[in-house]
């Protein structure tokens, strides 16, 4: 998702996205450890997405945007 689309989400939807992304990261790490992961770059993408979501969450708490 684009950052603009993420900013349009409600706080509850944002929290849900963060939880879903963390679950996905856990599954990807497990696949990496067992040698089943086809694309290791997927881990990097998910981690960046989590960082984006947390940044938006922090901005809202601080009233920056």
Curated annotation (Swiss-Prot):
Q: Which domain of life is it from?
A: Bacteria
- Does the entry feature the keyword Metal-binding, yes or no? no
Which is one Gene Ontology cellular component term of this protein? cytosolic large ribosomal subunit
Alphabetized GO MF terms: structural constituent of ribosome
| CDD domains for this protein | Ribosomal_L29_HIP
Q: Which UniProt keywords are given for this protein, alphabetically ordered?
A: Ribonucleoprotein, Ribosomal protein
NCBIfam families to which the protein is assigned, alphabetical: L29 (TIGR00012)
The name this protein goes by in its record? Large ribosomal subunit protein uL29
Annotated source species: Desulforamulus reducens (strain ATCC BAA-1160 / DSM 100696 / MI-1) (Desulfotomaculum reducens)
Q: What is the lineage of its organism?
A: Bacteria, Bacillati, Bacillota, Clostridia, Eubacteriales
């Amino acid at each position: 998702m684009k950052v603009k689309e993420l900013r349009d989400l409600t706080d509850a939807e944002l929290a849900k996205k963060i939880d879903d992304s963390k679950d996905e990261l856990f599954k990807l790490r497990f696949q990496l450890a067992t040698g089943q992961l086809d694309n290791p770059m997927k881990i990097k993408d998910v981690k960046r997405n989590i960082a984006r979501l947390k940044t938006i969450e922090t901005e809202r708490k601080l009233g920056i945007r």
